[in-house]
Regions:
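The feature marks long, low-complexity, polar/acidic/proline-rich intrinsically disordered regions embedded
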Residues: 47-48, 55, 63-254
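The catalytic "switch" region of P-loop NTPases
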Residues: 1-76
Length: 254
């Protein structure tokens, strides 16, 4: 005999059956049992493994792990990208298709960067998520149409705040580093305006933020922001924003 194996979204199929017959009263699941003898639910995917698979499949290695980037002290970009992506995706419960689209977009960004560019891997992934979920606010962020307090209040509407917190006192999450990159680059975009932003106060015994943010460890965030200023040497996000918006020429084939 012939055995048919069906891969379906049962909930959507039940909705389609009800729509076809024009009634919400139909027991669609019982109707399907006429045709389906055995059901098997696929296990939830291992997000960390899937992110690593997409990293290899779209050949991120060719760019992020190039000899020139390693010589320029950028060897941590791979780890930052994978850790941040994994933290966000686990918290957001994205579908596999959504995850793939995020990685494709991220790889396209890298294709328009040279090996000498700072690519802010954690921030880039976060900005692509913001652009996907709320494109209007994304435009406000990159066009300096928000105050710092408005940006602080907007972040929890996109990302679960637990991704920014680590119980360990010795380290921070990749997402917190991405948040620090966001505030750093946001401040850099105001650098040549009449109202430049100062994010930290280093005159005290411990670094302190000059703004109020309740959902992260303020000392860790202040230290991460100071780390951004030291590491990126006042570089901004101009090139990355153009690459995210697909306005820069492609320099590399995927």
């Amino acid at each position: 005999g012939i055995v048919f194996v069906l891969s379906i979204d049962k909930e959507q199929l039940c909705n389609s059956i009800r729509g076809h017959y024009g009634s919400d009263r139909i027991n669609a699941e019982e109707y399907l049992r006429r045709f389906i003898d055995v059901e098997y639910l696929l296990p939830k995917p291992d997000i960390e493994s899937y992110c690593k698979y997409l990293y290899e499949y779209f050949n991120f290695k060719e760019f992020l792990e190039s000899d020139e980037r390693y010589r320029n002290g950028l060897s941590g970009d791979k780890n930052n990208l994978l850790r941040c992506a994994t933290e966000i995706i686990k918290a957001q419960n994205y579908s596999l298709r959504q995850i793939e689209k995020l990685f494709v977009h991220t790889r396209l960004v890298l294709c328009s960067c040279s090996s000498r560019h700072y690519v802010f891997p954690s921030l880039t992934f976060m900005l692509i998520c913001i652009r996907t979920i709320n494109p209007q606010y994304y435009q406000k962020i990159i066009n300096q149409q928000l105050t710092l307090d408005e940006l602080v209040n907007f972040i929890p509407t996109i990302f679960p705040v637990n991704i920014f917190n680590n119980k360990s006192s010795l380290s921070h999450t990749a997402s917190l580093w991405g948040l620090a990159e966001l505030f750093y680059c946001f401040a850099q975009s105001f650098l040549r305006t009449p109202q430049p932003l100062q994010l930290t106060n280093v005159d005290s015994s411990k670094p302190k933020l000059t703004f109020t943010i309740e959902y992260v460890d303020n000392e860790k965030l202040a230290n991460a922001i100071i780390g951004c200023y030291r590491f990126y040497s006042d570089a901004g996000w101009g090139h990355i924003i153009k690459s995210i918006d697909l306005l820069n020429p492609i320099l590399e084939q995927i």
